[in-house]
């Protein structure tokens, strides 16, 4: 990654005159860099995109295959009023032969945990 902290994102965005660049949160990068989600919430309503995936220790896994506290992260985001987009990011080699199955697994996980119907 070129930008590894929310503060670096803020600095880069301040250099862009168009206002079209927005900050994002990559769950895996946040964990890998030993950061807390609250640092990204400092972006406020500008935070508009989140890469959502499970991980162990530094791979992008389908939800439920790793050991991250995904429910805790989603609760924090909901409590903070996050209204942006999520992208499922699951590119671990185990999914290459059937990537659709990883999507289905993550969607089922989200439904099981009441994230959406």
Spans of model-derived segments:
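Histidine-acidic metal/acid-base catalytic patches
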Residues: 3-117
